Design a protein with these regions (language model features):
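Positively charged, small/polar-rich N-terminal and surface patches that mediate targeting and assembly
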Residues: 1-115
Length: 115
Protein backbone atom coordinates (compact mmCIF):
# COMPACT_ATOMS: atom_id res chain seq x y z
CA UNK A 1 0.00 0.00 0.00
CA UNK A 2 1.32 3.45 -0.92
CA UNK A 3 0.91 6.42 1.39
CA UNK A 4 0.96 10.19 0.96
CA UNK A 5 1.14 13.10 3.33
CA UNK A 6 -1.53 15.69 2.68
CA UNK A 7 -0.49 19.08 4.03
CA UNK A 8 -2.95 21.96 4.25
CA UNK A 9 -1.72 25.38 5.40
CA UNK A 10 -4.77 27.47 6.16
CA UNK A 11 -6.01 30.56 7.90
CA UNK A 12 -7.03 29.61 11.44
CA UNK A 13 -10.69 30.37 10.75
CA UNK A 14 -10.77 27.56 8.15
CA UNK A 15 -9.33 24.86 10.43
CA UNK A 16 -12.60 23.25 11.57
CA UNK A 17 -14.19 23.46 8.11
CA UNK A 18 -11.11 21.81 6.62
CA UNK A 19 -11.15 18.97 9.14
CA UNK A 20 -14.87 18.36 8.56
CA UNK A 21 -14.36 18.43 4.79
CA UNK A 22 -11.48 15.95 4.99
CA UNK A 23 -13.51 13.60 7.17
CA UNK A 24 -16.41 13.67 4.68
CA UNK A 25 -13.96 12.64 1.95
CA UNK A 26 -12.60 9.75 4.01
CA UNK A 27 -9.71 11.39 5.84
CA UNK A 28 -9.22 10.23 9.40
CA UNK A 29 -6.85 11.53 12.03
CA UNK A 30 -4.99 14.78 11.60
CA UNK A 31 -2.04 16.46 13.27
CA UNK A 32 -2.62 20.19 13.79
CA UNK A 33 0.34 22.57 14.04
CA UNK A 34 0.01 26.28 14.87
CA UNK A 35 2.05 28.41 12.47
CA UNK A 36 2.85 31.89 11.24
CA UNK A 37 3.70 32.76 7.67
CA UNK A 38 5.20 35.49 5.56
CA UNK A 39 3.42 36.07 2.28
CA UNK A 40 4.93 37.25 -0.99
CA UNK A 41 3.16 40.60 -0.72
CA UNK A 42 4.08 43.03 2.01
CA UNK A 43 1.40 43.54 4.66
CA UNK A 44 0.55 46.63 6.66
CA UNK A 45 2.58 47.32 9.76
CA UNK A 46 1.66 48.86 13.08
CA UNK A 47 4.56 50.49 14.94
CA UNK A 48 6.95 48.42 12.85
CA UNK A 49 5.23 45.10 13.56
CA UNK A 50 3.62 43.12 10.78
CA UNK A 51 0.57 41.06 11.63
CA UNK A 52 -0.14 38.25 9.21
CA UNK A 53 -2.62 36.37 11.36
CA UNK A 54 -2.11 32.88 12.66
CA UNK A 55 -2.35 29.80 10.51
CA UNK A 56 -2.93 26.11 11.00
CA UNK A 57 -0.94 23.37 9.33
CA UNK A 58 -3.01 20.20 9.00
CA UNK A 59 -1.06 17.01 8.35
CA UNK A 60 -2.86 13.86 7.22
CA UNK A 61 -1.19 10.50 6.47
CA UNK A 62 -3.46 8.81 3.92
CA UNK A 63 -3.50 6.05 1.35
CA UNK A 64 -2.25 7.65 -1.89
CA UNK A 65 -5.53 7.56 -3.87
CA UNK A 66 -7.50 8.72 -0.85
CA UNK A 67 -5.15 11.69 -0.45
CA UNK A 68 -6.15 12.94 -3.92
CA UNK A 69 -9.85 12.65 -3.05
CA UNK A 70 -9.37 14.55 0.21
CA UNK A 71 -7.28 17.24 -1.52
CA UNK A 72 -9.97 17.80 -4.16
CA UNK A 73 -12.67 17.94 -1.48
CA UNK A 74 -10.69 20.55 0.48
CA UNK A 75 -10.18 22.64 -2.65
CA UNK A 76 -13.88 22.43 -3.51
CA UNK A 77 -15.20 23.16 -0.02
CA UNK A 78 -12.73 25.90 0.92
CA UNK A 79 -12.32 27.45 -2.55
CA UNK A 80 -8.56 27.62 -1.98
CA UNK A 81 -7.74 28.76 -5.51
CA UNK A 82 -9.89 31.89 -5.18
CA UNK A 83 -9.73 32.90 -1.52
CA UNK A 84 -5.96 33.19 -0.91
CA UNK A 85 -6.59 31.76 2.54
CA UNK A 86 -4.58 28.61 2.17
CA UNK A 87 -2.73 26.03 0.17
CA UNK A 88 -2.91 22.24 0.18
CA UNK A 89 -0.63 19.67 -1.42
CA UNK A 90 0.42 16.04 -1.17
CA UNK A 91 3.84 14.46 -0.78
CA UNK A 92 4.66 10.80 -1.45
CA UNK A 93 5.81 8.80 1.56
CA UNK A 94 8.30 5.98 1.08
CA UNK A 95 8.65 4.52 4.57
CA UNK A 96 5.93 4.75 7.19
CA UNK A 97 5.87 3.23 10.67
CA UNK A 98 3.32 3.50 13.42
CA UNK A 99 0.04 3.46 11.52
CA UNK A 100 -2.62 1.54 13.42
CA UNK A 101 -3.36 -1.78 11.65
CA UNK A 102 -7.08 -1.04 11.99
CA UNK A 103 -6.56 2.18 10.02
CA UNK A 104 -4.73 0.25 7.29
CA UNK A 105 -7.69 -2.15 7.06
CA UNK A 106 -10.03 0.86 6.69
CA UNK A 107 -7.84 2.21 3.88
CA UNK A 108 -7.91 -1.20 2.17
CA UNK A 109 -11.69 -1.45 2.52
CA UNK A 110 -12.16 2.03 1.05
CA UNK A 111 -10.00 1.04 -1.93
CA UNK A 112 -12.07 -2.12 -2.46
CA UNK A 113 -15.28 -0.09 -2.22
CA UNK A 114 -14.02 2.28 -4.91
CA UNK A 115 -13.25 -0.53 -7.38
Amino acid sequence: MKFAALVAILADDLEERAIDSAKQAGGGGVTIIDAKGIGAEEKKTFFGLTYEGSQSVLLFILEKKLSVRVLKQLDRDLDLANTSKGVAFTLPLEHVAGIDPAQIRRFEQRIRDDI
